[in-house]
Amino acid sequence: MVVQPDIPGDNDPGMGRRLGVDVGTVRIGLAMSDSGARMAMPFETLARETGLKDSDKQDIDRIAEVICDNHIVEVVVGLPRDLKGNGSKSVKHAKDVAFRIRRRMHKNGWEHVAVKMADERLTTVVATQALRASGVSEKKGRRVVDQAAAVEILQSWLDARINVLENRTIP
C-alpha cells in the first residue's frame, strides 16, 4: 500500500522554528530549526516509551514540552517508506506519534502548530554513514543516530519548503 507524505510549503505557517521527529522502536530523535526555518540542528534523543495501545507516556510529554517551550510552529514527523513508497509497521508507529502530538497540541490550546508527515526513506542509513565518516564511534553513534536522522528529515523538509515558497507565482 503506497503511503503519501505531506508536501512542504502547503498551508505553510510562515516564519518560526520547526521540530523534526524520527520515530524509532527504541528511541525518538529530535532536531530543531533556527527561527528562520533554514537550518536543522540536532536537539535531543528520547527513550521511546509510548506503544500503539498505550496512553501517552513521558516521550510524548517531553515532545509537547519542547514544542511549547521553543514556540515551534510546525512539527515534521518522518514517514518511513520503502523505495517503492509502501508503508510498513513503522509507518503505523510514526503516524501514531504524529496523531498523539497533534492531539496534545489541541488539548493544550496550541492548535496553530501544524503536524506534518515527511518522506524519510533512507534517512537513518544516510545519518549512520555521515556519523561514521566523521569519525563518531559506533557506541556513541547509537546514541546520536536518531538525532542525525531527525536532522536529515527536517533539513530535507526545510530545503523543499524554501524551494516551493521561492518558486510560487503570485497571482
Swiss-Prot record:
The protein's matches in Pfam families, at most eight in alphabetical order, are given as: RuvX
Cellular component terms, GO, for this chain's entry?
Answer: cytosol
Record keywords: Cytoplasm, Hydrolase, Nuclease, Ribosome biogenesis
Q: Does the keyword Ribosomal protein apply?
A: no
Protein's cellular compartments: Cytoplasm
One GO MF term: nuclease activity
Any one GO biological process? rRNA 5'-end processing
The enzyme's first-digit EC class, named in words, is: hydrolase
Q: Does Hydrolase count among this protein's keywords? A: yes
What InterPro entries would the database entry show?
A: RNaseH-like_sf, YqgF, YqgF/RNaseH-like_dom, YqgF/RNaseH-like_dom_sf
Fetch the SMART domains from UniProt. YqgFc
- Cite the EC number: 3.1.-.-
Instruction: Give the matching PANTHER family.
Output: POLYNUCLEOTIDYL TRANSFERASE, RIBONUCLEASE H-LIKE SUPERFAMILY PROTEIN
Protein family according to the UniProt entry = Belongs to the YqgF nuclease family.
* Its biological purpose: Could be a nuclease involved in processing of the 5'-end of pre-16S rRNA.
Protein name from the UniProt record: Putative pre-16S rRNA nuclease
